Amino acid sequence: MYIPKHNRLEDKAEIYALMKHFSFATLITQNPLTATHLPLLLEDDGKIRGHLARSNKQWERLEGAEVLAIFQAGHAYISPSNYLSRDVPTWNYTAAHAYCAATLIHDEDAAVSHLECMVNLFESGREVPYSVDMNEDFYRRMVAGVVCFELEIVRLKAKAKLSQNKPLGTRQNVRLELEKSEDSLERDVAERMGKLE
């Protein structure tokens, strides 16, 4: 990923927070080049865990492979109508690229634990959270239909392209315009821009 110096994100805690909050990611493998959009969970141990449908043959290329997991935060079109001087439109965004070594999880109990963890995470905060009893035969049979994996981060790159190359007045105009948006992704960009002022 091309990252000019002024767009480089280096704070690991900030990058990890992005990866946890925007966990619906893109997993890319090679030979042939394949991408799958899926939830990936960054765990406290710094490893990323996920699963693919067994019918998705991408899992066959995971074991021992270098893979790329892309996490994308909010993004927004930036109109020159908010600039203080004449310029061109652009796009603001924040993204993290995790280059990883992949390992398949063969242990059924570990796979069950991963799936239970994922459901509990995404159900938390709901008024009536769905409860999973992974010991039930139904869920054990479902585990056979997926392949769980673990990704060890080898290299991590992150970029925040948030109009840092523009004058403060322009950045403020852009941020204020994005704050008015009904689109939560655009408001995320505004919030990230505000932290830079």
Positions of PLM-derived features:
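An N-terminal domain-start capping segment
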Residues: 48-68, 179-184, 190-197
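C-terminal edge-of-domain segments
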Residues: 103-197
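Short, charged/polar surface micro-motifs in flexible loops or helix N-caps
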Residues: 32-34, 41-48, 54-57, 73-77, ...
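A generic structural signal for short beta-strands and their flanking turns/coil linkers
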Residues: 23, 36, 46-48, 63-67, ...
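Short, structured beta-strand-loop surface elements
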Residues: 55-114
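An N-terminal domain-cap segment
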Residues: 1-48
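Catalytic micro-motifs at enzyme active sites that drive phosphoryl/nucleotidyl and oxygen chemistry
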Residues: 15, 28, 58, 84-87, ...
